[in-house]
Swiss-Prot record:
A Pfam family matched in the record: Trm112p
Name recorded for this polypeptide: UPF0434 protein Noc_2677
Matches recorded under InterPro entries: Trm112-like
GO cellular component: cytosol
Gene3D superfamilies according to UniProt: 2.20.25.10
Assigned protein family: Belongs to the UPF0434 family.
PANTHER family in UniProt: PROTEIN PREY, MITOCHONDRIAL, ZGC:162634
Amino acid sequence: MDKKLLEILACPVCKSSLIYKKADQELICKACRLAYPIRDDIPVMLEEQARQFDPEEEI
């Protein structure tokens, strides 16, 4: 994931910043508790494609 791209991306739901989780190839929004998948190095920033994650899940 390109660092500059990560700096400009925001959660499409709440506009919060995102955290890159390399091991799972996801972008995490802590505010919404959503994890957006990254497929073929392209972030899929669609709410319906995101998964809800448990607040106790390690980020």
